[in-house]
A protein has these predicted regions:
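Extracytoplasmic gate region of multi-pass secondary transporters
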Residues: 44-46, 252-305, 363-368, 402-409
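C-terminal ends and interior cores of transmembrane alpha-helices
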Residues: 97-118, 327-342
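Helix-loop-helix hairpin linking two adjacent transmembrane segments in secondary transporters
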Residues: 163-214
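Cytoplasmic membrane-interface "Motif A"-like loop-to-helix N-cap segments
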Residues: 85-96, 312-327
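Extracytoplasmic
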Residues: 25-56, 272-277, 366-367
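Cytoplasmic helix-loop-helix junction between adjacent transmembrane helices
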Residues: 128-167
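Residue-level signature of mid-helix packing/kink "hotspots" within the transmembrane helices
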Residues: 42, 68-77, 137, 171-172, ...
């Protein structure tokens, strides 16, 4: 009978030190990859008013926003597959280069006669932003795949929770830099040009310094030293893992349910992020509304860290932790539905920050640590060329659901306005989305609470945190032998 064995000790001091060194490099590089993507994306958003003032039709700008969202969603499905089939670092670098080109073409169009050509202007800018969305889609799935190659399931929640702060760092950098450029009286085009160029330079640095896997860096791992032993005693190298197909990834246990659940959670996040400033303007001036709503974004940053850390404390029961976060969120949404008009400002600020944490935590952890856990399913026998595809499915499904769900919000507002209750129906809708998303994880929650042999897992009471991988049992050294 064929079996797998480990023929060398991988735990030498030199090997461990080298591994830890490269982990820091990978963490920092992929963090910067995603931060750069958000910096360039947000920089464009910050100067949309200037773009329209230069002559671009507001309808074209609106179409650019919608087009970006849909190509980003569709691109997530494709780029995840590319990251599993080719060098993920090269795919990420390609995304960074592509984003640079698209943004520079937008600046070029705004600096030449193109912007004054009524027949060609709309097509130029819309095409640039559609392609830009596809290139930006490399960020989530492929960077997550690289991280998954370097960080095991032990402590994964906290590590990925810290890692997901990248988007906020990028957004903050964009806000600070764009504000400085505009306040200093420089041309608004520099708000896009400078981050675009830095983005491209970082792509080259990333391409030549980041190894895809420990094996590429010359680090000995169990995988690199494993051999197959036949009944006759002959040894041969284990065949390299092959990328799994889209359908196979979609049919992995819990991928479908998490993809759908994430869609509802992301819809709640998008609604809060985009609608809060508008909702608050019925009680505050525009400037105050933006400041107050920013507390929601501030709360999202520690959300992923807290959610990941708590899920590690509870031995990887991420579905249970996510459900707890969502369970706390529902009564707060109900509170807003009924009493938002009378909530004191100080209490409102605290609640918004807390709600940002509750929404941001599950959203961030599902697309990182949970996706990595799902890609570790025993049915694909530790195939490390599945994570990009799995993350792409979850990311893409969430973006599509959120994009279509946004269409319901103005309709619900009009109904509420006609009935004299304002945004109350919108809040009810968000509560329904929260409950629906949590319900989709009910099977996973039950298995985490009541694990059994049929689920290929041992009871949690018999295992430590280092043994439980969240979605499969990790064999002990004795079992490996």
């Amino acid at each position: 009978m064929t079996k797998f064995v480990v023929i060398d000790d991988i735990n030498s001091k030199e090997n461990t030190e080298k591994y830890e060194k490269y982990q820091k490099v990978v963490f920092g590089s992929t963090f910067m990859n995603y931060a750069m993507a958000h910096w360039t994306r947000k920089s464009y958003t910050n100067v949309k008013v200037s773009l329209m003032a230069s002559g671009v039709n507001p309808l074209t700008v609106a179409a650019m926003d919608s087009g970006f969202m849909f190509t980003y969603a569709g691109g997530s499905f494709i780029t995840g597959q590319l990251g599993d089939r080719f060098s993920p670092v090269a795919v990420v670098a390609g995304g960074l280069f592509g984003s640079t080109i698209c943004l520079l073409l937008i600046v070029f169009g705004a600096s030449t006669s193109i912007i004054h050509n009524a027949a060609f202007c709309g097509s130029w800018f819309l095409t640039c932003q559609l392609v830009h969305g596809a290139f930006q889609a490399t960020g989530g799935p492929v960077n997550t795949a690289i991280m998954g190659n370097w960080f095991s399931s032990k402590g994964r929640g906290l590590i990925f929770g810290l890692w997901t702060c990248h988007q906020y760092v990028g957004d903050i950098a964009a806000a600070i830099f764009s504000g400085w450029i505009l306040h200093s009286g420089y041309d608004w085009r520099w708000c896009i040009t400078v981050p675009a160029l830095i983005n491209g330079i970082w792509g080259f640095i990333n391409l030549w310094t980041v190894p895809n896997t420990p094996e590429e860096a010359g680090i000995i791992t169990e995988k690199s030293k494993a051999t197959v032993v036949s009944p006759s005693g002959e040894k041969s190298e284990v065949a390299e893992a092959q990328p799994i197909g889209f359908i196979q990834a979609f049919m992995l246990p819990n991928v479908m349910s998490y993809a759908l659940a994430f869609g509802f959670f992301k819809l709640v996040n998008y609604a809060m992020f985009f609608q809060l400033p508008l909702i608050l303007t019925s009680h505050f001036d525009a400037s105050t509304s933006n400041v107050i709503s920013s507390l929601y974004s501030v709360g999202m940053m520690p959300g992923g860290i807290v959610c990941g850390w708590v899920s590690d404390l509870y031995h990887g029961r991420r579905a249970c932790v996510i459900a707890t976060f969502m369970g706390i969120l529902c009564p707060l949404l109900l509170l807003f539905a009924w009493y938002m008009d009378t909530i004191p400002v100080i209490v409102l600020l605290i609640l918004l920050a807390f709600m940002g944490c509750l929404v941001g935590g599950p959203n961030n952890i599902i697309t990182s640590a949970v996706a990595a856990d799902l890609a570790d399913d025993p049915s694909i026998q530790g195939n490390n060329k599945a994570l990009g595809t799995v993350t792409g499915i979850i990311n893409g499904s969430g973006s599509v659901t959120a994009a279509f769900g946004q269409l319901a919000i103005p309709i619900l507002f009009e109904w509420g306005k006609a009935d004299g209750v304002g945004y109350r129906y919108v809040w009810y809708f968000l509560i329904a989305c929260t409950i629906a998303g949590t319900s989709l994880m009910s099977g996973r929650i039950y298995k985490e609470l009541y694990p059994n042999e049929e689920n290929d897992r041992q009871p949690l009471s018999a295992q430590g945190a280092g043994h439980y991988r969240g979605y499969q049992a990790v064999p002990t050294q004795e079992e490996k032998a």
